[in-house]
C-alpha cells in the first residue's frame, strides 16, 4: 500500500514531458507586403513572458508575397501568405502551456528605419502556431532610400 502511494506521488510530481511545438512568424509592413530577404529580413525572438527565458529566434526570410492577394483583402480565416512568402519557422519544446512573446525588429537592411513590435499569446504543447499565416505581426514605419548620400554616410557641415 505504501509503495503504491509512493509511486502515485512520484507520478503526480514528475514533470510533464516537453512536446515539440512548431511556430511560424510572418511580418507585414503596415499597408504593404511581407518583409523578407530583399529588406534584410526581420529579427525575431520568442521568449517566455513569465520567466524571460529566450526559447528561440532567427531571421524572417523569403519573398514579399503575392501583391494582389495581400492588397486585395481576404475573407476571414484565409491566409495572405503563399508558398515562398517571408517566414521564420522554429520549434520550441513546451512541457506546459506558456504565455509566449514574440519580439520582431526590422527591416535589418535598413537600420535607419528599424522598429520593434511585440505580441503575446498562449501557446499549448504540441499545438503549433502554423495555421494560415501563423503568428502574423505588422511592422509600422517607412523606408526611404536616399541615393546621395547613402543612408550609412554622413555629410560634412557646409556641404
Question: Model-derived features: where do they sit?
Answer:
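N-terminal signal peptide c-region/cleavage motif recognized by signal peptidases
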Residues: 13-15
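Short, compositionally biased P/S/T/A/G/V-rich stretches that sit at domain boundaries
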Residues: 122-159
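Beta-strand signatures of extracellular beta-sandwich domains
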Residues: 43-47, 103
